[in-house]
A protein has these predicted regions:
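Non-catalytic alpha/beta scaffold blocks inside enzyme catalytic domains
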Residues: 1-11, 15-187
Length: 187
């Protein structure tokens, strides 16, 4: 718009309201497949399967729902349970009244967060305490789309654990732990 792209001290930055929102877009925790790939494209699914060491048949051949579609699914009674990870949907969603109404309709809400005091966590039927940034190893992507490495510098309090460990434990409990069998760290 101003003609300053590519000049020193300038650039296009994603201004978002959530921590690591850029990472969530790049690594597809919403409606797309890893790295901007498409669930509907067999070649993309094969590529992601190879990169992540996951059997191709474990990757869905249809798109998942975007955030607004998830909330609509809850409002329509099609979605009965939700697992919310590291975000406060009740407070930060564009239409918080709609988000709160949808969250209140759920039969089962799981919230995995480092704060049990958020509006969303207060509604949870099950709260999974999560480790904070200095209590786990990991990566993040900043608004300049640069990757950063987070080193663990202290132990998480109480029963809190890294998201990665929570995912692995729940996957094992659900009987699909083999999907994570080759993954030994979140990197």
């Amino acid at each position: 718009m101003t003609g300053n792209i590519g000049r020193p001290g300038t650039g296009a930055n994603s201004v978002t309201g959530q921590c690591n929102a850029m990472g969530s877009r790049l690594f597809a925790n919403a409606s797309g497949l890893l790295g901007g790939r498409d669930f509907l494209n067999a070649g993309h699914r094969a590529e992601v399967s190879r990169l992540l060491h996951i059997a191709p048949e474990k990757i869905p051949a249809k798109n998942s729902l975007a955030y607004d579609q998830i909330l609509q699914g809850v409002a329509d009674g099609k979605i009965k349970g939700l697992w919310v990870i590291a975000t406060n949907t009740a407070h930060s969603w564009v239409d918080s009244a709609r988000a709160n109404g949808s969250l209140d309709q759920l039969e089962f809400l799981v919230v995995q967060d480092m704060y049990a005091t958020t509006d969303t966590a207060q509604r949870a039927h099950l709260f999974l305490p999560a480790a904070g940034w200095g209590e786990k190893e990991g990566t993040f992507i900043n608004s300049e789309r640069r990757f950063g490495h987070i080193k663990k510098v202290s132990r998480a309090p109480g029963h809190a654990m890294s998201d990665f460990n929570s995912f692995r434990l729940i996957a094992n409990y659900w009987g699909c732990g083999e999907v994570f069998s080759q993954w030994t760290s979140p990197q």
